[in-house]
């Protein structure tokens, strides 16, 4: 985004005057997170300084490490996760707060699930990951290309329970990378995953996404 004239590193990009990272932390606090862990790559020194100055009312872990993929970032963060319930996302994933609250509530209530994955039928992604579900929204597969039945794509928000971390360790030891391959591995190892539809989820990848995201949040 710097090449497109955006002056901030992505976590500090403002939407309606609020930095992406502040918005995300605030949403997690409002939904009763018991701790927050953030990984930042080594080049983002401005973001590191910004986060080091934060004071939160719950335990806050900041990990500075550059990794080859988002799955590796999750693996590095997983060492800081002590509870049974995890919600994972990236800083550029924009969603409606009230939908996120409903999502968290369903994950807590459906305690037999190994994972509840945010999905949307709003497709504005360069390389979407299609999510194949049954009639009850249990996930059958994750696909790079849509087949006839795929209504949803991955929204990039993941609620997971402890068994999913075992699969993560297996995926790393097998040399896998990328979150989409990890998600396929969750299915391959027989974990119970369900999809939770959001009306719309936007990724802030480019400068013109900032205005789109701002108007979406105001709508």
Where are these regions (language model features)?
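Short beta->alpha linker loops
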Residues: 16-19, 42-43, 65-69, 99, ...
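A structural signal for short hydrophobic beta-strand segments in well-ordered beta-sheet cores
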Residues: 12, 131-133, 195
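Conserved beta-loop-beta/alpha segment of the NTase-like Rossmann-fold superfamily
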Residues: 47-48, 55-134
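Phosphate- and divalent-cation-binding pockets in alpha/beta enzyme and binding domains
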Residues: 23, 46-49, 72-73, 167, ...
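Short, well-ordered beta-strand micro-motif
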Residues: 14, 80, 132, 159-161, ...
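A generic "structured core" feature
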Residues: 6-9, 27-31, 38-43, 54-55, ...
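N-terminal glycine-rich phosphate-binding loop and ensuing alpha1 helix
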Residues: 1-47, 101
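Catalytic-core segments of class I nucleotidyltransferases/pyrophosphorylases
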Residues: 108, 138-202, 208-219
